[in-house]
Amino acid sequence: MPNTQSPYIAFAMLLSSNGHPVTPAELHGLLIGRSCAGAGFDADAWLADAAQLLETEPGDTVRNALVGLQEMVKAELTGEDVAIVLLLPSDDAALADRAAALGQWCQGFITGFGLNAGGKDLSTDAKEVLQDLVAISQVQEALEESEDGENDYMEVMEYLRVAPLLLYTELAKPEAPATKPSLH
């Protein structure tokens, strides 16, 4: 039985109760994808991109959750860790549900990246990561409820925790340094 207290379930319930037909995985993928493409961390720009996926302007509760999610992602991408935490169903959810969410995360990432990459030149490694994400977004039904299926899922999930960092490192705009007042 899935953990009803998981962050994924809580966010899914928040989105659903506010009439947004999107999963937390797809929203999180969108946020990571746009951030890795160099969109920066401006809350208004993120909320505008999220509103397109949500199909309506988010209310205050959802808006606050989205801003909090962005702050978490910013800390992960700009921090010292070499992996990100994916917003996916917990391990006690059915493998089919987790695999579907993984595919939705990849679809969101590709959308967010595409909206913000703007024809930037990509290295061969970056192109391979994007091709992998496209492939992963399409194979979610291929995982079977078995030990091999579980191992395959974990392997793909671990890859997705680090692969976007290559794109972020290559494409993301550095934070503009604060201007220092000058004495004249």
Curated annotation (Swiss-Prot):
Classification via Pfam families: UPF0149
Name under which the protein is recorded: UPF0149 protein PSEEN5316
InterPro entries per the UniProt record, alphabetical: YgfB-like, YgfB-like_sf
Classification via PANTHER family: UPF0149 PROTEIN YGFB (PTHR37528:SF1)
HAMAP family: UPF0149
The organism of origin for this protein: Pseudomonas entomophila (strain L48)
GO cellular component entries: cytosol
SUPFAM superfamilies: YgfB-like
